[in-house]
């Protein structure tokens, strides 16, 4: 009987197997904790992005109301309201460059306008305005409004990530590249560009040059200036109409 009882005894679990089971259980707990932490982080980030969007919307509305109020006050006093000098331009290359001077080629390269119907944002200052004058016969440019900036970035926005052109389908892509500058989402990127913020250069360099479509209805006269009924040169606020036709 004793022999039968000994046979029925459950064999002891090897120590190595116990250790494996412990390690597996610990690993599972770590993974669950990490997953939970990531979930909470995503939730917190979504909330932050929502709050930022609300704040920017309020800021844009305030800017618009201030402009309206200033114009109204000027009219009331019998004066003309002169808005502040624009700080932002959107530049579109409209012509090829066969046979042009090396200087024009160089400026177009600096503006990152390597192909016809490429577009880029430019911070306006004395140096950049001089550059635009040099290449004016080959570009159409003007002052984009908030709607244009918004639609360009949302519809045609690509980022330069590891020297590759990547579609901005996720805020995480922006956060990874520009998070160190406090830019973590599309709304941050749009705000930095539109207001020409302190990190405009980094935000603008992150954006790949926009590849626009040929304008609906075609172009009138590429070689003639806009003020003479053509397409080239500074069209001020009218650039927004051209953007609509090409976006």
Curated annotation (Swiss-Prot):
Task: Give the CC-aspect GO terms.
Answer: cytosolic large ribosomal subunit; endoplasmic reticulum; nucleolus; postsynaptic density
Oligomeric state and interaction partners are given as: Component of the large ribosomal subunit. Homodimer. Interacts with DHX33.
**Looking at the record, which segments are called 4 X 12 AA tandem repeats?**
7-53
Entry-annotated residues carrying N-acetylmethionine: 1
Source organism, top-level taxon:
Eukaryota
Query: What NCBIfam families is this protein classified in?
Result: uL30_euk
In which broad location class does this protein mainly occur, judging by the first location in its UniProt entry?
Answer: cytoplasm
Its biological purpose is as follows:
Component of the large ribosomal subunit. The ribosome is a large ribonucleoprotein complex responsible for the synthesis of proteins in the cell. Binds to G-rich structures in 28S rRNA and in mRNAs. Plays a regulatory role in the translation apparatus; inhibits cell-free translation of mRNAs.
- Modified sites of kind N6-acetyllysine: 123
Q: Where in the cell is it found?
A: Cytoplasm
Give one Pfam family, short name only.
Ribosomal_L30
Q: Can you say where the sequence repeats lie in this chain?
A: 7-17, 18-29, 30-41, 42-53
Instruction: Give the record's GO biological process terms.
Output: maturation of LSU-rRNA from tricistronic rRNA transcript (SSU-rRNA, 5.8S rRNA, LSU-rRNA)
Natural source organism? Pongo abelii (Sumatran orangutan)
Lineage of the native species?
A: Eukaryota, Metazoa, Chordata, Craniata, Vertebrata
Post-translational modification Phosphothreonine, affected residues: 16
PROSITE patterns reported for this sequence: RIBOSOMAL_L30
Tell me what this protein is called. Large ribosomal subunit protein uL30
